[in-house]
Amino acid sequence: MSTQMSVFLSQDSAAPHWGEKALLSFSETGATIHLGEGHDLGAIQRAARQLDGQGIHSVLLSGEHWDLESIWAFHQGYRNPKKHGLLEWTALSEEDQTELQARIKATDFTRDIINKTAEEVAPRQLATMAAEFIKSVAPEGTVTARIVKDKDLLAEGWEGIYAVGRGSDRTSAMLQLDYNPTGDENAPVFACLVGKGITFDSGGYSLKPSNFMSAMKADMGGSGTITGGLGLAILRGLNKRVKLILCCAENMVSGRALKLGDIITYKNGKTVEIMNTDAEGRLVLADGLIYASEHNPELIIDCATLTGAAKNALGNDYHALMSFDDELSHQALTAANKEKEGLWPLPLADFHRGMLPSNFADLSNISSGDYSPGASTAAAFLSYFVEDYKKGWLHFDCAGTYRKSASDKWAAGATGMGVRTLARLLNEQAEK
């Protein structure tokens, strides 16, 4: 039978026998997290990981020092996809309790769907699960959703999604979700959110080695993150019309699969030569960005686990941000800072758009030359599919979406990082 442990916060140091600068101590009343001076949320998250690692399956956050942010930090560290520990806390104000429950609902959706196996989350299932989640958090009657799949993708001109997914036995899909709280079917679309939804990425014929393929069930992390962000924005009161567009496919090897040298002709007329089938995320996102541009929104945001280059630059602790719109980038970075999430700008300039030459098409899907800035040229590729790419477009390369192994703050698996930033950014832009 499991016994609940009370956990307290203290600014006092632990007794010497617990070790120098000990973070945790224990007594008959429970465990105490020793923060020292200040209110270090990172220390709280690390303590939660330690308690989970010690097999503490039920926790009550007790005492007077627990507030919204400290409870949230503990939840982030304590959550474990294998153990599902029980976490309870003392009463918060109604406003803080509502916010905490909204964060948990949105980020738990994101973490759970990214952690699921590729067998559980095929492209059509990803689109369906995302639509069901948004419907569950939105006011009744404000959400409509359409899933375009298989040969219908070709009929409607979504060549990139179809081409990437044609090597799989699992049907590719594009989710076209409309959140419209205005009650006016002719209301302008304020924002379009585009997510990369590669539910498993083998690399295709540019095959990944096993150690790089082992986490590729999480290559739909951009879709999971941006769906969670929209969900949290809705729970926080988003009052403008938003389209959610998820570009879902499985990148596999077969006799039907995309081959090097193939050329894709996109709906906007751009032709792309395939020089690496493992640079597939940008190929599906291109369709989503074209569809987004057709609605003339004020804001286009795409999220994708797009490049290893971003992860090499930033590790797991930051997402990368790229944009030609400096003012909007600053607002996104400010939103991340307010939400205490890691977001870091990487360069994106006009000359990056010239680093994708092809002898047979308008563009290659990879850059040429030695020491190519892979994250920047991937974003530059996407810019060819955003009608007004200089203004109102943000690209998130989600380096911090998933951890292959546990750290001192996180269990292995999805983090949910970026959900709060996206929600705040959407709501702040909508209120202007």
Swiss-Prot record:
Positions annotated to bind Mn(2+) 1: D201, D278, E280
Entry keywords, A to Z: Aminopeptidase, Cytoplasm, Hydrolase, Manganese, Metal-binding, Protease
InterPro entries: Leucine_aapep/pepB, M17_PepB-like_N, Pept_M17_PepB, Peptidase_M17_C
CDD domains: Peptidase_M17 (cd00433)
PROSITE patterns: CYTOSOL_AP
Cofactor(s) it depends on: Mn(2+)
Active site (catalytic residues): K208, R282
Subcellular locations according to the entry: Cytoplasm
MF (Gene Ontology): manganese ion binding; metalloaminopeptidase activity
One Gene Ontology biological process: proteolysis
Residues reported to bind Mn(2+) 2: K196, D201, D219, E280
SUBUNIT field: Homohexamer.
Described function: Probably plays an important role in intracellular peptide degradation.
HAMAP family found in the cross-reference section: Aminopeptidase_M17
Protein's name in the database: Peptidase B
Lineage start: Bacteria, Pseudomonadati, Pseudomonadota, Gammaproteobacteria, Vibrionales
